[in-house]
UniProtKB/Swiss-Prot annotation:
Provenance organism: Corynebacterium jeikeium (strain K411)
Assigned keywords, A-Z: Amino-acid biosynthesis, Cytoplasm, Histidine biosynthesis, Isomerase
Pathway: Amino-acid biosynthesis; L-histidine biosynthesis; L-histidine from 5-phospho-alpha-D-ribose 1-diphosphate: step 4/9
InterPro entries: Aldolase_TIM, His_biosynth, HisA/PriA_Actinobacteria, Isoase_HisA-like, Isoase_HisA-like_bact, RibuloseP-bd_barrel
Pfam families tied to this protein: His_biosynth
EC nos: 5.3.1.16
Family: Belongs to the HisA/HisF family.
Protein name per its UniProtKB record: 1-(5-phosphoribosyl)-5-[(5-phosphoribosylamino)methylideneamino] imidazole-4-carboxamide isomerase
Any GO MF annotation of the entry: phosphoribosylanthranilate isomerase activity
EC category name: isomerase
Name of the encoding gene: hisA
Reaction it catalyzes: 1-(5-phospho-beta-D-ribosyl)-5-[(5-phospho-beta-D-ribosylamino)methylideneamino]imidazole-4-carboxamide = 5-[(5-phospho-1-deoxy-D-ribulos-1-ylimino)methylamino]-1-(5-phospho-beta-D-ribosyl)imidazole-4-carboxamide
Active site: D17, D136
CDD domains linked: HisA
Gene Ontology CC annotations of this record: cytoplasm
Length: 258
């Protein structure tokens, strides 16, 4: 089980999801549900200026296998002064090296970690904390199943894959309850705590954050190993500002109710 100092604040990663050159948000990760929010660089710079230390940058076209926004994402990464976590369509050595060549601090690997365990183990060994593994999951008939290829294929049973990744020495996991993503109905705290308890790797929460209370709830389990959270639609929809979210997370770390 991963454990973290109680006084450490939850790290927030504002998301910039890119499709067809635009910053967009999806509902439950489904292609065709995009809402456009304009130029990705404007969104990323806005979050940087608001105090973000990380940006979660996603190439949705690459994730869905329908194209690439690589040059644009490379340009965005190059213009930022904060850490970038890059995700979407990273499935082999070539695409991994290409992603890291943008200057990003970390890449997320999803589908390939499910479909090619040997390659996944090699990547974990070679790249260490430059690689996080994304576990996108949905409850099906009472069982947590993983989703791959832009959430369109089955990737196996969550706990079996988690045991394998933990034994391979995975350095970080990004956990998404697909049913919560883009729905603004709260993160699945119980699932996140269960995953954190089953691994030594720190967990990044993704999907469902809708309020400052959600931020506080996640910040309250940092010491259990859920040390970061990706925030997307709630910020774009104006549910709260990034400044407010950062203050809420820091308030929990300080032991005050803000």
């Amino acid at each position: 089980m991963a454990s973290t100092d109680n006084s450490r604040a939850l790290t927030l990663l504002p998301a910039v999801d890119v499709a067809d050159g635009q910053a967009v948000r999806l509902v439950q990760g489904a292609a065709g549900t995009e809402t456009s929010y304009g130029a990705p660089i404007e969104a990323a710079l806005a979050w940087q200026n608001a105090g973000a230390e990380w940006i979660h940058l996603v190439d949705l076209d690459a994730a869905f296998g329908r194209g690439s926004n690589f040059e644009l994402l490379k340009e965005v990464t190059g213009q930022l002064d904060v850490n970038v976590e890059l995700s979407g369509g990273i499935r082999d050595d070539e695409s991994l090296e290409r992603a890291l060549s943008t200057g990003c601090r970390r890449v997320n690997i999803g589908t390939a970690a499910l479909e090619d365990p040997e390659w996944c183990e090699s990547v974990i060994s070679r790249y260490g904390d430059k690689v996080a593994i994304g576990l996108d999951t949905r409850e099906v008939d009472g069982e947590w199943r993983l989703r791959g290829r832009g959430w369109t294929s089955d990737g196996g049973e969550l706990w079996e894959v988690l045991e394998r990744l933990d034994s391979q020495g995975v350095s970080r996991l990004v956990v998404t309850d697909v049913s919560r993503d883009g729905m603004l109905n709260g993160p699945n705290i119980d699932l996140l705590r269960e995953v954190a308890a089953a691994t030594d790797a720190p967990v990044v929460a993704s999907g469902g954050i809708s309020s400052l209370d959600d931020i506080r709830a996640l910040a309250a389990v940092v010491h259990e190993g859920v040390d970061s959270a990706i925030v997307g639609k709630a910020l774009y929809a104006g549910k709260f500002t990034l400044e407010e979210a950062l203050e809420a997370a820091q308030g929990v770390a300080r032991g005050s109710d803000i």
